[in-house]
Design a protein with these regions (language model features):
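Membrane-interface, cytosolic juxtamembrane amphipathic helix immediately N-terminal to a transmembrane helix
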Residues: 27, 33, 113-158
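Juxtamembrane/interface alpha-helical elements of multi-pass membrane proteins
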Residues: 2-79
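Hydrophobic alpha-helical transmembrane segments and immediately flanking/interface helices
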Residues: 70-94
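Amphipathic alpha-helices that form helix-helix packing interfaces
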Residues: 38, 42, 67, 74, ...
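Bilayer-spanning, highly hydrophobic alpha-helical transmembrane segments
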Residues: 5-17, 139-168
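Short, non-transmembrane cytosolic segments of multipass membrane proteins
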Residues: 91-121
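Alpha-helix N-cap and coil->helix boundary residues
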Residues: 52, 83-86, 103, 122
């Protein structure tokens, strides 16, 4: 009976490991989607209203999550007169390490360099380019999620089943 319980626990643990890996990919995709939405909003605001950057970043104050605290920090730094490329360093670091999205961090790094140097039209054009890159990354992550998600679940189930049979 104890062997059966141990085998069942191993199988369940392996399934949960597969689900956790799939959940991580889903979270990365959600972060990319939120980031792309933020950059699209920046593009629209820069083109239509010419909204100052500190105000654009400050509008994100009510959003919650790992991504939005560095965005609020960027807004506060921009309001103090810190150059955009230095003000966005916390966001870039969060994307590189906290979210493990180095491609998104590279794209946002390019945007941060453009935000402080060019007029609103050029900044909006850069936002459009960055949105396209983020959308492409999101599509790649979706493909990875569908392919690897199934693979993670199948492999974890198989490994758990083999271990369970060995214990039986």
């Amino acid at each position: 009976m104890i062997r059966l319980l141990g085998a069942a626990l191993l199988l369940l643990g392996a399934l949960l490991a597969g689900q956790a890996l799939t959940g991580l990919l889903r979270r990365k995709r959600a972060v990319l989607r939120e980031l792309r939405g933020f950059v699209e909003m920046m593009q629209a605001e820069l083109l239509q209203r010419g909204t100052p950057l500190p105000e654009l970043f400050a509008r994100q104050a009510d959003r919650r999550g790992l991504l939005w605290e560095p965005v609020r920090d960027c807004g506060r730094a921009l309001a103090r007169g810190v150059p955009a490329d230095r003000a966005m360093e916390p966001l870039l670091e969060t994307l590189k390490t906290g979210e493990a999205l180095p491609e998104a961090a590279a794209a946002m790094g390019e945007l941060s360099r453009a935000l402080g140097k060019y007029d609103a039209g050029t900044q909006a054009e850069r936002c459009k380019q960055i949105c396209a890159r983020l959308e492409e990354q999101e599509k790649q992550l979706w493909t990875t999620l569908t392919e690897k998600g199934r693979l993670y679940r199948a492999l974890s189930f198989s490994a758990g089943a083999v271990l369970a049979l060995m214990l039986w």
